[in-house]
Amino acid sequence: MRKYIRESILIVVFSTLSPWLLAQQQFTLYDELPGIYKSYKPACSDDLPGWAKMLYQFPVNMTEISKEFDRYVLLHPTEKSAAIRYYKMWRRALEPCTLPDGTIEMPDAGRFYENLLHDQLEVRKNRETSQVTGSNWTFLGPKETFWLNESGSAIPPSSCPWQANVYSFDVSGSDNNVIYCGTETGYVNKTTNKGLSWQLAGQDYPFGGGVTAIAIHPSDPDVVYVAAGNQVHRTLDGGITWTPMLTTGNLFNADRMKIDPVNPLKILAASSNGVYISADGGLNWSKKWSAPAYDIEIRPNDNSQVFALTSANGKFSLIMSTDGGQTFQVQPGFPSTVVESSGGLLAMTPVNPNTMLAILLSANNTPYLLKGTLTGSAWTWSLQATGLSGSFPMNNGQGYFDLVLDISPVNENIILVGTTTLYKSINGGNTFTAVGGYAGNFNIHPDIQDIEMLPNGETWVSTDGGMNLTTDNFGIQANYSVRVNGLTGSDMWGFDQGWNEDIVVGGRYHNGNTSMADFYQPKALRMGGAESPTGWVLQGKSRHVAFDDLGNGWILPQYAEGKPEGRFIFSKYPNMEEYGGRRSNLVHHPSYYGTLYLGEGTGFWKSSDMGVTWDLLYNFPAKVRYLQISYSNPLVFYADIVGAGLCKSTDGGASWVQKPSLTSPPYGTANWKGKLFLTVSPSDENVIYACLQNGTWSADIGKVFRSSDG
C-alpha cells in the first residue's frame, strides 16, 4: 500500500536558521521591473552560491555580482538551475540602467508601463482610423530553421526545432487547426493549418514582454487572451487588433490563464501576485488570493470547483473554490510540509475528474509528483513519484521557467511531465521514460515550456526552440514533426551581414548560431553553438563566416541542402558580452578584403591575412567596444572604450586621442562611455553619427548626435 506523502517525505526543519536567511525577503525592488518575471525566482536558501544570494539583496552592485557569477560559471560550465536562469534574465533587464561603477539606477517602471499602454492604444486607434502607415520592411528570417547537412547526405535535412523560444500556447477547442503561441521576445504567432505555417498576430502591436500565458475562447477561436508585459491583452478578431485590458493601477503578469468552458466570460489567472478573476470577458479584474499562485485548474465537468497551487511560509499549498473562484480556502488534505523551491503545476483530466496530479519542485533539486483522489467529498493525497530516481529521473531543471505537466484527456495512465527533459509514463506515474531534451529518442530542444494533450490523440509541446507535434503521444518517430515554418521570435544576440552576397549570420539566445542567405530562402541553417552574441561575415571571399563558439571559420554550402565546403583558420574574435547588448565588431579595410581590425580585450588588433594571424597595434586601458573605419580615409578610426568613451586615430590605429565632447554635457553623459553605437560618413572622415546602445531606461533614449569636425 502506498503511504501518504506526509509519511513518505522526510522534511527536516532546523530550529535555528542562518542569520542571512532570516534577514532576506523573497523579492526586491529589482524584481518589480519590466523584463523580470518574479515567478521564475527560486526560493531563498542557504545552499545558494554567493552571487545568487545577492539576488535577494537591495541595492546590488552589478560589477560585483557579475564577477561572482562569471567565476562560478568557469567552475560549473554545464550547470543549469533556477538561480542561473533567473540571474540571466535579471542581468539582461538591469544592464541598460547600470552605471560604469556598477551602480544600478532604478528606472521609473510606472512611466514605462504608462508609455507602453499609450503605444498599445495608439496602435489600435491608428488602425481604426486607417492611419497605419505602410513600410518597405519584410520579414527576412529565420523563417524555418533546418539542420546543417554536415555529412553531405543525399537526403535533404529536415526542419529543426531550434528557432524561437515559445513560452506559451493554446489550441482552439472548437478548431484544432487554430493555435496561438507566444515567444519570449514578445511575439504572438497564429496558425490556421495546425502549425504547417505561422503568421504574426498583431505585428505592429507592442505586447511589452515575453508571452507567459494564452487562452482561447472555447467556441470562438477569434477571441483570445494573452498575458505579456504585466498586462492581459484581448483580441476579438483573430489577432488583427488587440486591446490592453488592465489599467495602470491594476497590472499583473499571469503565468497561467483558464477560461470557464461553461461561462466563457469568466477568466481565471494565476500570477506571482495572486489569483485574479474576470467575470466580464477581461474588462474588469479582482484579486481573490494574495499569495503567489503557480497554476490554476477548473475541475472537468464541474466549473464551480477551482483549484490553485500556491505557497505559504516556504511550503506548497493547494487552495480550492467551490463557488467558481469567488472565494478560496486552503485544501486541508494537501500535504503542508513540502518545501517550495521553484514552483509547481497541477493537472486534471476529463476522463477521470476525481483525479488530480501536482508536480512540486522541492529542495535538493528534487521534484515530487503527487496524486490526489476524490473520495466522497474529500481529497486524499499520496506520493506518486520522487525525482532523481530510477523510475522518475527528472530533476528541477531551471525551475518554473521550463516546467510542464499534463494528463491525457482520454487515458489517465498517460502522463507527460518535464523540465529540461520531457518524461512520459504509460502506467499512471509508476515509472517514467525520457522522451526528448537532454535524453530520450525524440530530438526535442531541451527546456520544455508548455504542453497540451488533446482528445484526438495529438500532443503539442513548446520548447526553447519552437513548436512540436506528435499524433501518438511520442510513440514512434514517424508520428512526430517539427512545426516552426514562419514562427517569428528568434532572439538575435549576434548579427552581421555580407556586402557582395546577401548573407546574414548571428548567434541566437537558446538556439545557437544561424546562417541565412537569399539563395537559401526560405530556409535558415542551424550552425550549432550555444548562446554567444557572435556571427561574422568575411566580405572578401564567398560564403566565409565565423562564430567564436564553433572554432575555426566555415565555408557555407552553395545551397541550403548542400554540404559545407570546408573550414578555415580564424584565430581571434571581437569582445562579445552576453546578451549581445555590449559587443565590439569586426571591421574590414575598404580597399583590401584580407585586412581586418577588431577589439579583443583591451587591444586594437589588425590582421593582414584574413584572420589567420593578428598584430596588436594599440593597448587601451579598458575594453574596446564598437569600432568604425573611414571609407574616405582608411587611416582614420573611431573606437568606443569602456570608461573613456569616444577615441580617434588618424594613423591607422598606432596612436589614439580621446574625444570627450560626445560623453559630456550638453550632449551625452559619462554613462555613455563604452555604450556607443556610431557610424562614419562614407565621403567625409570627420562626419560621424552616434547614439546610445540599449538606452531604453535612459532619458537619452532616441537621441542621435552628429559631429562634422571629427
Question: Model-derived features: where do they sit?
Answer:
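Bacterial Sec-dependent N-terminal signal peptides
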Residues: 1-30
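Beta-propeller blade termini and top-face loops
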Residues: 29-710
